[in-house]
Amino acid sequence: MVQKCIKSVVEFSERPVIKLDAKSVEKYIQLPNDIRQKYTSGKMSDAALSDLIRFSLLEHFGGTWIDATVLLTGKIPEYILESDFFAFRDTFGLIENPATISNWLLHSVPHNIIIKEAKNMAFAYWRNEEYVVDYLFTYMILQIAYERN
């Protein structure tokens, strides 16, 4: 399924698509030693590391992050690609949660203040903690960064 999703992103994208793995991400960013050590020791999940990578890449380079499990059925609209910041908002049905900004597709220009603040909050959190406080943690920090800016 993941390969089908990746193929759909390549098919419908009019911009270069960079597929990341543990090795290729090192060409673009260097994670701090304490974060890498926390991850390799098992005190940080793959999802948490992915969030730090996502925010770091977007803050530095800008662009569009699409999770590997997103199946595109058409081109990404220009209004998304031309935005300084774009994220989908979702009320999650009846779930009581103040975080409504999703992270599975994010777009930003380089050095976007919302992405930068979310990145800084995520790194500060993981430097001091060893487990995620809530499944929607990343949505929460995106919501906070968005509301503050």
Language-model features: locations:
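Glycosyltransferase-associated regions of secretory-pathway enzymes
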Residues: 1-51, 68-149
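Small-residue hinge/turn detector
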Residues: 51-63
